[in-house]
């Protein structure tokens, strides 16, 4: 690893830091990329569609409005995201199939696990600004995540020499 979020925060004090309710569920704990956003409530239809498209090392940021009644991500959509080159997923909501998620080379951050699958009603909005955890998540802005936390920046940050402070 060539960078950590603490080092990026030291180097770029203007970045925005997400409040820390998120847990790592994926096989990758360090990931970054430009954001694609989804706003949905207990319906992962848009997530399923996006995971089937080329990810190009982007990060899917999902505002599930904090609901933990239904998991928005499980092993099938996550495996599709891996196969299509997504770097990671940040979910303001729940996930399931946690043992399988942990075995996949995908960053997955969410609030908690929930065994109940989503209801598919073909609802949700893509590429709209969303806000949760005290942070505005804007399509095309960059997300950086590791075991220390999540930060966002309007532009990509130079990662060269970002490690090594403190």
Swiss-Prot record:
Source organism phylogeny: Bacteria, Pseudomonadati, Pseudomonadota, Gammaproteobacteria, Lysobacterales
Enzyme Commission number, as recorded: 4.1.3.17, 4.1.1.112
Subunit structure: Homotrimer.
Biological function: Catalyzes the aldol cleavage of 4-hydroxy-4-methyl-2-oxoglutarate (HMG) into 2 molecules of pyruvate. Also contains a secondary oxaloacetate (OAA) decarboxylase activity due to the common pyruvate enolate transition state formed following C-C bond cleavage in the retro-aldol and decarboxylation reactions.
Reactions catalysed: 4-hydroxy-4-methyl-2-oxoglutarate = 2 pyruvate; oxaloacetate + H(+) = pyruvate + CO2
Binding-site residues, a divalent metal cation: 97
An example molecular function term from Gene Ontology annotations: 4-hydroxy-4-methyl-2-oxoglutarate aldolase activity
Any one biological process term the GO annotation gives: regulation of RNA metabolic process
SS bonds (residue pairs): none
Keywords, ordered alphabetically: Lyase, Metal-binding
Enzyme class: lyase
Cofactor: binding comment: Divalent metal cation.
Matching Pfam families: RraA-like
Family under the similarity heading: Belongs to the class II aldolase/RraA-like family.
Segments crossing the lipid bilayer: none
Protein name: Putative 4-hydroxy-4-methyl-2-oxoglutarate aldolase
Domain of life: Bacteria
């Amino acid at each position: 690893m060539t960078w950590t979020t603490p080092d990026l925060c030291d180097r770029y004090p203007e970045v925005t830091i997400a409040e820390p309710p998120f847990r790592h569920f994926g096989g990758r704990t360090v990931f970054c990329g430009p954001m694609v956003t989804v706003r949905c409530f207990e319906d992962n239809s848009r997530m399923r569609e996006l995971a089937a498209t080329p990810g190009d090392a982007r990060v899917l940021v999902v505002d599930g409005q904090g609901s933990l009644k239904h998991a928005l991500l499980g092993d099938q959509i996550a495996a599709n995201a891996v196969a299509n080159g997504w770097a990671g997923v940040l979910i303001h909501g729940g996930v399931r199939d946690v043992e399988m998620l942990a075995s996949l080379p995908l960053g997955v951050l969410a609030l908690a696990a929930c065994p109940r699958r989503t209801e598919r009603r073909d609802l949700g909005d893509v590429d709209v600004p969303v806000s949760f955890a005290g942070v505005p998540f804007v399509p095309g802005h960059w997300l950086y995540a590791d075991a220390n936390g999540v930060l966002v920046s309007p532009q990509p940050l130079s990662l060269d020499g970002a490690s090594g402070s403190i």
